[in-house]
Design a protein with these regions (language model features):
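Short, flexible, mixed-charge acidic loops at enzyme active sites
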Residues: 12, 133-138, 209-214
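Phosphate-binding loop of NTP-binding sites
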Residues: 18-23, 32-177, 181-192
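Adenine nucleotide phosphate-binding catalytic loops in nucleotide-utilizing enzymes
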Residues: 22, 26, 31, 151-154, ...
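Glycine-rich, highly charged phosphate/nucleotide-binding loops
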Residues: 5-21
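NAD(P)-binding Rossmann-fold cofactor-contacting core
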Residues: 1-3
């Protein structure tokens, strides 16, 4: 709080005063855990004021980083940690997002540096992206979750697929073909798709004889 005030930023606590309800904001940065149905937030939804999450702001200032972005219902923290350990061998690796550091903090601390970021993302964070485009992304699996926040299970699944919506052909999306829900919802993928499986070998990436093979 004190640091924000030192920078001339007004801080309001214990409520949302009506004086903040304006329609001329360029955008609003929302804590991803706050529902869009909360009256104060919903005011801006109804007036079509752009609402983004911290990940989007961090990316705007650090789009030069190299991102491996992971989301899914279960296992994403484990996968993110494993990716970080692999990237560490190259050096300049950081883990961020739902674990590790906030992306905006990294953008501030390493504005001029090249970093390889293992980034764990929740669907709450993905709901508030606009330009975020990782070089590599994966939805590791899908199962019903967060139905106290999302209007439907379909909306929850669709929010996960936002992870690749801004990607280009040269980017990669890793698709888990062992998960029928991922296959059903991973559509209109704008980047190069790498299908992987633990049970099949007619895919791009598979396991055989204790090794991982990329065709």
């Amino acid at each position: 709080k004190a640091e924000l005030q030192e920078r001339g930023i007004q801080v309001y606590e214990k409520g949302h005063p009506d004086i903040l309800k304006r329609e001329d904001y360029a955008f609003i940065v929302k804590n991803p855990g706050i529902k869009y149905t909360v009256p104060f937030v919903n005011y801006f939804v109804q007036h079509q004021v752009k609402i983004v999450t911290e990940v989007e702001i961090g990316y705007r200032y650090a789009s030069h980083f190299h991102y491996g972005a992971i989301t899914g219902t279960n296992g994403k923290t484990t996968i993110t940690t494993m990716l970080y350990e692999m990237l560490q061998r190259k050096g300049n690796a950081i883990v961020a997002g739902n674990i590790g550091f906030p992306l905006s903090a990294l953008a501030y601390d390493f504005e001029e540096e090249e970093k390889y970021v293992a980034l764990e993302l929740s669907n709450f964070q993905l709901l508030g992206i606009e330009t975020f485009a990782p070089e590599v992304s994966v939805v590791c699996n899908l199962a019903p979750d967060h139905l106290d926040y999302m209007p439907s299970v379909e909306a929850y699944y669709e929010s996960k697929m936002r992870i690749y919506e801004n990607c280009q052909k040269e980017d990669w999306f890793l698709r888990n073909v062992d998960d029928p829900t991922v296959v059903a919802y991973a559509k209109n993928i704008p980047c190069t798709t790498i299908d992987f499986s633990l049970t099949r070998q007619d895919v791009d990436l598979y396991r055989k004889d204790g090794k991982v093979w990329l065709v």
